[in-house]
Amino acid sequence: MSSSSRCAKLDRPTRRLALVALAAALGGSCVAAQPAAPAELRSEVPTARLQGHGQLRFLGLHVYDIRWWTPTAVSAHEALSVESALEIEYARALKGPLIAERSIKEMRRVGEFSVVDEARWLGQMKQLFPDVQTGDRITGVNRRSEGVRFYVNGRLAGEVRDAAFAPLFFGIWLSPRTSEPKLRAELLGTAP
């Protein structure tokens, strides 16, 4: 037997061990690590964890990516009543007033509110929501009985201080009456 064939035989167990180690290392890296919550959430929802995420497309166009941050795993039943945050990262430029107007339209789908509330909330959102560019983020924090606090690119923009506003605004994405049920399932973490 030549020395080269002897080395080949001796190397097989070593090779197998190396392949097993490599497979274990690669397998471990394929497990998705829990992403860190945005900095603005550290004081708002200190134990924030990513419950779910998705992407909104309209007529095939990528509009935004959205992530729902919760303190613990949340069921669909309690989605609108828990302090949590929705982070929207825009994939295209949009006008702030149009974002506010679309929000009101979607809130109407979720529940009822007066024309007085509509005018007040629309005015507040038009002040809070800037024109956005690709990569800009608007994060809404559901403060339940206090309303919703908004951050734009990590900086506090202001808040809508009305407990009735919070479940309607978050309901745009999390209510069973949402216009985007597939996106809701992705945010709740129940999508197949």
Language-model features and meaning:
Residues M1-P13, L17-G28:
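N-terminal secretory signal peptides
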Residues A33-P192:
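Terminal leader/tail segments of proteins
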